């Protein structure tokens, strides 16, 4: 590892708490704890906040995955992540994957796809925090990053729900995906199996977090320059 890489790692460690503290909050709660303040934000500004949240979530998930990989996953095992038994938990979700599929769906369904992804990851990230506590050498920064992503994912869910409500012009919206069956680990695995499962979770979440960011930015593009979007 060269000196430049070391310096970049040190600066990332020092600046990370300030980066998170400076991020624009998505939470629209008023003093009573309700979300009545969210509708008062324009759809354009709310979408901007949601995009910024998604960008940060993806960035931190990428850092978390790299940290976990370097600390716990030997290189030969990194190649096993895509083998049978380590499929992503969101593989069965009705999420558009190809460019042609994405181009054909409406703005509302594009946003709903983001919501499906967000909601399907809330429980797995809570589970991940629990399992990471079992690791003897898990760094405090890795634990903090995972906790931060888990908390911010809930805020992102709230923002996306309000956005869908605004786009549908509805006063109330309940959009909850039943993730039962998507994520169920009833038996405590051995340590190697636990490492591979956690590595798969982090890798798959990083991939889906990037997909959330792309979908939201595409939605923004459609609303500002519809005919020149990818």
From Swiss-Prot:
Disulfide pairs here are 28-38, 88-204, 221-229
Residues spanning the signal sequence = 1-23
Q: Which InterPro entries match?
A: 4_helix_cytokine-like_core, Somatotropin/Prolactin, Somatotropin_CS
Q: Which GO terms describe its biological process?
A: animal organ development; growth hormone receptor signaling pathway; positive regulation of growth; positive regulation of receptor signaling pathway via JAK-STAT; response to nutrient levels
Q: Per the UniProt annotation, where are the glycans attached?
A: 137, 144
Q: Where in the cell is it found?
A: Secreted
Name the keywords, alphabetized.
Disulfide bond, Glycoprotein, Hormone, Secreted, Signal
Show the stretches that span the lipid bilayer.
none
Report the superkingdom from the record: Eukaryota
Molecular function as annotated in GO: growth hormone activity; growth hormone receptor binding
One Gene Ontology CC term in the entry: extracellular space
Family, as annotated: Belongs to the somatotropin/prolactin family.
What name does the UniProt record give this protein? Somatolactin
Tell me the classification of the organism that encodes this protein: Eukaryota, Metazoa, Chordata, Craniata, Vertebrata
């Amino acid at each position: 590892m060269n000196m430049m890489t070391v310096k970049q790692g040190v600066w990332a460690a020092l600046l990370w708490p300030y980066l998170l503290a400076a991020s624009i909050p998505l939470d629209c709660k008023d003093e009573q704890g309700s979300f009545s303040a969210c509708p008062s934000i324009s759809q354009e500004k709310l979408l901007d906040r949601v995009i910024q949240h998604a960008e940060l979530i993806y960035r931190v998930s990428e850092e978390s995955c790299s940290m976990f990989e370097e600390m716990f996953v030997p290189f030969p095992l990194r190649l096993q992540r895509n083998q049978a038994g380590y499929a992503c938990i969101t593989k069965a979700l009705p999420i558009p994957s190809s460019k042609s599929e994405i181009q054909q769906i409406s703005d509302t369904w594009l946003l709903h796809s983001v919501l499906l992804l967000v909601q399907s990851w809330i429980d797995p990230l809570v589970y991940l925090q629990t399992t990471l506590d079992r690791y003897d050498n898990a760094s405090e920064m890795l634990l903090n990053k995972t906790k931060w992503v888990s908390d911010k994912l809930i805020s992102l869910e709230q923002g996306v729900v309000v956005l869908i409500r605004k786009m549908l012009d509805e006063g109330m919206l309940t959009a909850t995906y039943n993730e039962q069956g998507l994520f169920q680990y009833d038996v405590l695995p051995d340590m190697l199996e636990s490492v591979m499962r956690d590595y798969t979770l982090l890798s798959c979440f990083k991939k889906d977090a990037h997909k959330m960011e792309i979908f939201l930015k595409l939605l923004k593009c459609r609303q500002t320059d519809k005919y020149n979007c990818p």
